[in-house]
């Protein structure tokens, strides 16, 4: 998603800062220590936090009319970021937890709270965090949009148009060929764990990359350890689900508040 946005001539996201998720966690602790005990008001603290974030986002790559940032799990801090940037808009990317967990394990991605040697605990963690992020996104109407990975790669033109409309951006054909703009419009941070994937064109191969990678015992437990999968519309009844329903024209008509 980040590379697709970066391909737009009016947008610059740049590579993952790999700093802001930790900073957002730290500032929560600082608020308790300083705002409550030293006379520093929330407004003053917010100004300081937003100034730091703005400097990082604005200056870690070239300027553009519209700036964006993509760092894993920053959506967990959506209420705070909305307060700091009341005119900002947010995209919550949603993907099948089985693909997410497989990707973390396969690429050895270090994400706080995820123990890659314990698959079940990873699904539990995903369930908790996605539920929280989805709830927070749903409570930011007009500011936050949910985008399903499985729909984006099957209906890229339609979904990208939906996204640009939400962001009040003109549609750009360049967004459909972000891979051709790597190193030009699209900058990569070689330390990003997703760098190798970003270099690929939009394709459906990743949909089934997790097939045959989990034991039947693990898959049978999903409804208990990650029930939010079903709420989001993912089929947990079979080991190799068909994602074609995510490409249906009426896909969004059957989405409830939680999904």
Swiss-Prot record:
Annotated SUPFAM superfamilies: P-loop containing nucleoside triphosphate hydrolases
Keywords associated with the record: Disulfide bond, Glycoprotein, Transferase
Enzymatic reactions: L-tyrosyl-[protein] + 3'-phosphoadenylyl sulfate = O-sulfo-L-tyrosine-[protein] + adenosine 3',5'-bisphosphate + H(+)
Cellular component aspect of the GO annotation: Golgi apparatus
Listed GO MF terms: protein-tyrosine sulfotransferase activity
Keyword presence, Transmembrane helix: no
Residues annotated for 3'-phosphoadenylyl sulfate binding in this entry: 95, 103, 107, 149, 194-203
Disulfide bonds listed in the record: 13-68, 137-144
Site positions for Transition state stabilizer: 70, 194
InterPro entries: P-loop_NTPase, TPST-like
Residues of the signal peptide: none
Glycan-carrying positions: 36, 115
UniProt EC number: 2.8.2.20
Protein name: Putative protein-tyrosine sulfotransferase
Class of enzymatic activity (EC top level): transferase
Similarity comment: Belongs to the protein sulfotransferase family.
Function: Catalyzes the O-sulfation of tyrosine residues within acidic motifs of polypeptides, using 3'-phosphoadenylyl sulfate (PAPS) as cosubstrate.
Gene: tpst-2
Origin: domain of life: Eukaryota
Active site residues according to the UniProt entry: 16
């Amino acid at each position: 998603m980040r590379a697709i946005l970066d391909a737009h001539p009016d947008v610059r996201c740049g590579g993952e800062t790999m700093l802001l998720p930790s900073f957002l966690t730290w500032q929560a602790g600082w608020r308790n220590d300083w705002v409550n005990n030293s006379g520093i008001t929330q407004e003053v603290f917010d100004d300081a936090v937003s100034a730091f974030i703005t400097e990082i986002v604005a200056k870690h790559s070239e300027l553009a009319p519209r700036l964006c940032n993509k760092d894993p799990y920053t959506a967990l801090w959506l209420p705070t970021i909305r307060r700091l940037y009341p005119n900002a808009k947010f995209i919550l990317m949603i993907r099948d937890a089985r693909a997410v967990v497989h990707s973390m394990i396969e690429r050895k991605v270090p994400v706080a709270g995820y123990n890659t040697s314990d698959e079940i605990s990873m699904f539990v963690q995903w369930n908790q965090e996605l539920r929280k992020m989805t709830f927070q996104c749903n409570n930011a109407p007009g500011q936050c949009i949910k985008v399903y990975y499985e729909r984006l790669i099957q209906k890229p033109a339609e979904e990208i148009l939906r996204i640009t409309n939400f962001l009040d951006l003109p549609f750009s054909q360049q967004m459909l060929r972000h891979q051709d703009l790597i190193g030009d419009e699209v900058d990569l941070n070689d330390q990003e764990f997703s760098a190798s994937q970003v270099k690929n064109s939009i394709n459906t191969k990743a949909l089934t990359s997790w097939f045959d990678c989990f034991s039947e015992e693990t898959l049978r437990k999903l409804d208990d350890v990650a029930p939010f999968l079903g709420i989001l519309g993912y089929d947990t009844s079979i080991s190799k689900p068909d994602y074609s329903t995510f490409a249906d024209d009426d896909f969004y008509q059957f989405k409830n508040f939680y999904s």
